[in-house]
Amino acid sequence: MVDRLVNSEANTRRIASVENCFGSSGVPLAMQGRVLVGEGVLTKMCRKRPKSRQFFLFNDILVYGNIVIGKKKYNKQHIMPLEEVSLESIADNQTYRNGWYIRTTTKSFVVFAATSTEKQEWMAHINKCVEDLLRKSGKKPVENHAAVWVPDTDASVCMHCKKTQFTFIQRRHHCRNCGAVVCAGCSAKKFLLPQQSTKALRVCDACYERLKHVPSSLGSGEDSAAATGAASGNKLNTTAGDSSNDEDSDEETASPGGESHDEPRFYGDNSVLSAVEDSSTITSPSSATTGSLEAPQVTPSVQSSPAAVATTGSHC
């Protein structure tokens, strides 16, 4: 079990190495009781394109970041509390494979592993950590999660009005409630979604109409959050652009398919698939083995969890 690694020198050394790789762009990760369970590279579907991201699984959080030049440093660190994490496997098809959803209340997206074995390892270890954490804390699993954004490339026209053609002038926008790609005219309103932000967020007209009629007496879940938003006063969208402020910027280059990557390495629990020996030290970001990552593609749909691969929230 990973518990026996809590006070081990190997665990302390691994966490210190992760902190060093993020440098000043990250926050301190070492804390009492925290164990680094595993690490490796996954392909994450961002808003515009799939990109390689370095993931670190701890016994209480999931951390990931951008891989910087040379694969020796990482930046744009993101931390997801495991008690909020829920996974859902995505069936393989002719276009993409080895993928699954990672969902939380504030952010949801899809990742792809290089092989089916790596997918099984990642999902098994994450689920095990979530189960252990919830059991120890006595908390119940989170039921409501942020929607997965439909990728920009999957919508050439507005998914709401079916008329507006997206161009350099007619920009794409994402509904923060359902994840659909919509035009400015079909997403001119904002609504407070408390689980995602303390500020009102852009939503499509369909979601706005539904959310504003949610009774304020509801006690929990998504409808409760919507009721809170309705009671707090929502407004027209006064911003000119889609202020998602994510890291999926045009100047950031996509990682080419088939790029070499670090094989995932897991520590301390040999009962979960092919975990490595406790004595293993953290993998050097520069060491790698070859694995083919296929670019994912999906059919967009407007629903609470669109069958699409992208990102939600303010970051990618």
Curated annotation (Swiss-Prot):
One GO MF term attached to the UniProt entry: zinc ion binding
Positions of FYVE-type zinc fingers: 152-212
Name of this chain's protein: Pleckstrin homology domain-containing family F member 1 homolog
Assembly description: Interacts with Gdi (Rab GDP dissociation inhibitor).
GO cellular component: apical plasma membrane; cell cortex; early endosome; endosome membrane; late endosome
Record's keyword terms, sorted: Cell membrane, Cytoplasm, Endocytosis, Endosome, Membrane, Metal-binding, Zinc, Zinc-finger
Segments of skewed composition (Acidic residues): 244-253
Tissue expression as described in the entry: In ovaries, expressed both in the germ line cells and in the overlying somatic follicular epithelium.
Biased composition (Polar residues): 298-316
Free-text domain note: The FYVE-type zinc finger domain is necessary and sufficient for endosome targeting and localization to the plasma membrane.
Record's miscellaneous remark: The name 'rush hour' derives from the overexpression phenotype which displays a disruption to endosomal trafficking and cargo progression.
Effect of a null allele: No visible phenotype. No effect on the subcellular localization or expression of Rab7, Rab11 and Avl.
Any Pfam family hit: SOS1_NGEF_PH
Record organism: Drosophila melanogaster (Fruit fly)
Gene3D superfamilies attached to this UniProt entry: Pleckstrin-homology domain (PH domain)/Phosphotyrosine-binding domain (PTB), Zinc/RING finger domain, C3HC4 (zinc finger)
Any one Gene Ontology BP term: endocytosis
